[in-house]
Curated annotation (Swiss-Prot):
Annotated EC: 2.7.1.24
Organism classification: Bacteria, Pseudomonadati, Pseudomonadota, Gammaproteobacteria, Cellvibrionales
Listed GO biological process terms: coenzyme A biosynthetic process
Keyword line: ATP-binding, Coenzyme A biosynthesis, Cytoplasm, Kinase, Nucleotide-binding, Transferase
Organism encoding this protein: Saccharophagus degradans (strain 2-40 / ATCC 43961 / DSM 17024)
Family in the record: Belongs to the CoaE family.
One Gene Ontology MF term: ATP binding
Protein name: Dephospho-CoA kinase
Record function comment: Catalyzes the phosphorylation of the 3'-hydroxyl group of dephosphocoenzyme A to form coenzyme A.
SUPFAM superfamilies in the record: P-loop containing nucleoside triphosphate hydrolases
Domain DPCK: 4-200
């Protein structure tokens, strides 16, 4: 398997902005947010389990999952959140491993908001934290998702703290300034990771 670089960050940190900058450099990105959506598509076992638990009212008219309704349920009851994770996390991990193994680029990015909160970090060789301060997280996430400040803060409370994330990271990208500033950091890390991948290949 290629060298795996985990990229994580709190809600509103701009993690996806950063990982999107690696793709034009020829680097494959495995995004667990997208995989999490795949495993609850119609006809998938995870969606069938969710429908059995909450009934057909958890679905939209077209048969897709009503994400807002499910999100409201799991935020209101921690036991429901734990149940949902017990159903979806194994499926997400299985598909994530398949995609990482199939990657053909010199190294591969594993993008995950819960990299350090779950066992996904065990799939990585190095970890990059995308960092902004908490006030920027709330402002950006609210503008992007239209969620209330309370909902965003509830998500932040379920994620590892900013300090703990930075302590566990091998590299940090400061995403609090301009896109150009972020891009220059990505370019520098790309050089580092390419050299690391080459060194591993030559062993």
């Amino acid at each position: 398997m290629a060298l795996v670089i985990g990229v994580t960050g709190g809600i509103g940190s701009g993690k996806t902005t950063v990982t999107n900058m690696f793709e034009p450099l020829g680097i494959e990105v495995v995004d667990t947010d997208l995989i999490a959506r795949e495993v609850v598509q119609p006809q998938q076992p995870c969606l069938e389990a969710i429908t059995q638990r909450y009934g057909p009212q958890i679905l939209l008219a077209d048969g897709n999952l009503n994400r807002k309704k499910l999100r409201d349920i799991v935020f209101a009851d921690n036991s429901e959140r734990l149940w949902l994770e017990s159903v979806t996390h194994p499926a997400i991990r299985q598909l994530t491993v398949q995609r990482l193994r199939a990657a053909k680029s010199p190294y591969v990015i594993l993008s995950s908001p819960l990299l350090l909160e779950t066992d996904q970090y065990t799939l990585t060789d190095k970890i990059v934290a995308v960092d902004v301060d908490e006030a920027q997280q709330v402002e950006r996430a609210s503008a992007r998702d239209g969620q209330s400040v309370e909902q965003i803060q509830a998500i932040m409370q379920k994620q590892i703290t900013r300090q703990a994330r930075l302590a566990k990271a091998d590299y940090v990208i400061d995403n609090s300034h301009t896109l150009e500033h972020t891009h220059s950091q990505v370019q520098a890390l790309h050089q580092t990771f390419t050299m690391l991948a080459t060194a591993i290949e030559q062993k």
